[in-house]
Regions:
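Extended catalytic/binding region for NAD+/ADP-ribose chemistry, centered on the ART fold
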Residues: 72-77
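Short active-site loop/helix that positions an aromatic residue
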Residues: 79-89
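Long, compositionally biased stretches
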Residues: 2-70, 90-155
Length: 155
């Protein structure tokens, strides 16, 4: 059983947006009022990062590089969202997934169906909702069988 978090890469493109204000013009699914965030990497939580709301200091979203969970993770970003975040080159994209933190660390899940995309150049971001996917909204982060989550929750 994996009882340690996935190892963090030595460098990530996410470092390019860390500490900068990131604007989410449409907010997040279920959380559209807060649009300004800052990505932080508290060392005690590595490789988990925090998207801290600048509009509501009580709101912090825990995020993780999806490739730590699923090395072959792939998404198709619709053109409307590419325009929204002014993303012209794939290499400028920072891809993260939201985590649901639970009291029992073995029950922490990642939403692979609703990834967050940030343009490292423009500082604009959006949350996607993937359709027709086998990914889960409750992908177990710590699991005996990596890659398994609650498949019935997949969109």
């Amino acid at each position: 059983m994996r009882d340690e978090p996935p190892a963090a890469p030595e460098w990530s493109v996410a470092a390019a947006v860390e500490g900068r204000e990131i604007s989410f013009p449409n907010g997040f699914v279920g959380c559209t009022d807060w649009k300004r965030f800052m990505l932080q990497s508290p060392p005690e939580h590595a490789p988990i990062r925090v998207l801290q709301s600048l509009d509501n200091p009580e709101l912090a979203l825990f995020v993780l590089d999806p490739f730590l969970l699923s090395p072959d993770y792939a998404i198709d970003m619709p053109e409307a969202e590419r325009r929204l975040v002014q993303l012209d080159k794939a290499e400028d994209a920072v891809l993260l997934v939201l985590l649901v933190i639970r009291r029992d660390p073995l029950l922490v899940t990642a939403n692979l169906v609703g990834p967050v995309v940030i343009n490292s150049r423009s500082g604009l971001g959006c949350q996607l909702v993937l359709e027709d996917t086998d990914y889960s909204v409750r992908h177990l982060v710590y699991s005996e069988h990596p890659g398994q989550g609650d498949k019935e929750d997949a969109a």
